[in-house]
Amino acid sequence: MATSGSRNFELDLAEYVEEAFERCGMELRTGYDVRTAKRSMNLLFADWANRGLNQWTIEQTSITLAEGIRDYPCGTLTMTVGASTSFTVGETITGGSSSATAQITSKPSSTTFAITIPSGTFTSGETLTGSGSAATTTLSVAVDFSDVRSTVDILSAVVTRSSTDFEIQRVSRSSYLDIPNKSQSGRPNEFFVDRQITPILRIWPTPENNTDVVKFDRLTRIEDVDSATDTVDIPFRFYPCLTAGLAYYISMKRNPQMMPMLKSVYEEEMQRAMDEDRDRASLRISPSYDYYRD
């Protein structure tokens, strides 16, 4: 008999839910069953983010630095405006009706700004005024924070100058606080991740030009499941783990007697998946030729 030749087995949300209910000793019957299971699955993904590194959710992000600005969003944060050409990188823009403020870190196009985390909330349609250039424009759409807020953590970072990458070291909150002169300028060599709801990348020394680029590998949230026909943002290695975890979460609400067994299966599947989802690198061992002579 011939094998199938296919390697594309994939479940959608409804099929995961059906399997999870069966593991709980029940049948999927109502629309509410799907809704409560969808909620449980999204909560399960939050648990995975707390458990450690999910390799498939790592993204590399690049941000062009601006002279004199040391705080940046941990992701892509832009404003779509009527025109950006008359504004200056590094200046502060202020909303005419909201009084919200942010600094321009770069101008990716003639109708966009890359900005720092705003103070206040800009309003779509309001007039923006530059502090130095006195230029004005209109904000076309509300600022979207979803990309920045999807960042769970930053794993590593470099600063690129003249096509050369220079590693920058991560420091703790207390170490960053202890820096006596945070305004000192130079090529950045340290960073601190301020893990707010909208996380901030704080770098030091403060950038000395508008051409250096910080590149960082960030761990991001797993994509939500929103409808029964959605496929799930995980590699196939995690299919058993997701099914076991969803069954365990559903059992808390529908069949508590099954919880101990389902939790045990989930933890076993989770450990197996996490052991596999890791970096691999070559290990080289060199013998030492030192010796003692009597």
Predicted regions: what is each one?
Residues M1-T76, T138-D294:
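Glycine-enriched, solvent-exposed interface loops adjoining structured elements
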